[in-house]
Amino acid sequence: MESNLSGTVSIPAPSISRRAFLASGTAFGASLLLERGAQAQSPGTGGVSGIKEYDVNTNGIILHVTEQGDGPAVLFCHGFPDTSYTWRQQMKAVASAGYRAIAPDMRGCGRSSAPTDPTLYTPLQTVGDLVGLLDALKIPSAVLVGHDWGATHVWQAALMRPDRFKAVFCLSVPFVPRGDVSVFEKMRKSGHQEDFYMFEQSRPDADQIWADAPVTIPGILYWASGSAPADKRWSPMDPARSLHRAAPGPLPSWAEPDYVAHNVAEFQRTGFHGALNYYRAAEPYFYLSAPWKGARITQPSFFIWGKADGLKELYPLTVDQMRSGVPSLIGGLELDNVGHWVQHEAPDVVNEQLVKFLQTVTPT
């Protein structure tokens, strides 16, 4: 396969919308249970036509699922703090290209089940959720798309079940093969236990720190993006530049009001305990993942990340370096003026590359 999709793309810096995000407003109603094939224009879809919503019992929980289009299956996995709504632009592009876009609210988020036990949020559970979802929909295999924690779980799903997941397209979080020492232990030994953001995210009081969704949801969207000033932008190693600070004003124009309002309402309703459990499960999973030490992802893959993403402090990788763990990496893009929210800050680039990738690995 050709690797000419690699490179750097410059995205114009976004303007600030004059429409201030209205953090107040009514909460969305309970999720609708829909038979597959029924048409829906619910609060979860923002009134987008052609969207279907339904609930699926899988792996001991209920996943709320959004779907659009017909054709080869493409399974989207979101991160923190997010819901399946984050993928609406990509789902539309994929469906228009002749694919079946399927996006669950990941366990702990949105209208899916949210177990309280943090040990139930490792890739062992989430990969089981995804396999069970494919089984329920009678889909033998799918292409995976992931962002943030969703990218982590997508990479792990490809590692564990190459028979069910035949290609991987990830945003923001690269695949890093398991080493001998966890990142948590490295931070302790280097004296950074009070600095590294994942320790704060794992603490019991993190639920309360994040609880005010009308403040924290717009805050993380702004501070983790390429729109924030470089010297104040989120840093995973500086508590003074945290993710949960209030945004200084109206969000940039790329943060669509319907999307922001949906996530604010959902997290104000559910709280953040389930979503934060992914951080609490991360260190225990390192020790559970010993059987996959040295394993590589062999499926065709593609990776996009923003040059202004704070995660690059933790993962300063090049595409060539990533190939040591993902030898079938077709290529990757680093986007100028883009931070962590790649699918929102640069949707046209992401959509174009995603459709090209799908047409390469699973033509319609």
Which functions belong to the PLM regions below?
Residues 16-25:
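N-terminal export leaders
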Residues 38-40:
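Boundary at the C-terminal end of the N-terminal hydrophobic targeting segment
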Residues 49-51, 60, 109-145, 149-330:
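Flexible "cap/lid" subdomain of the alpha/beta-hydrolase fold that forms the substrate-access gate
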Residues 58-67:
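A short loop-to-beta-strand scaffold at the N-terminal edge of the catalytic core in hydrolase folds
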Residues 67-111:
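Conserved HGGG/HGGXW glycine-rich cap/lid loop of the alpha/beta-hydrolase fold
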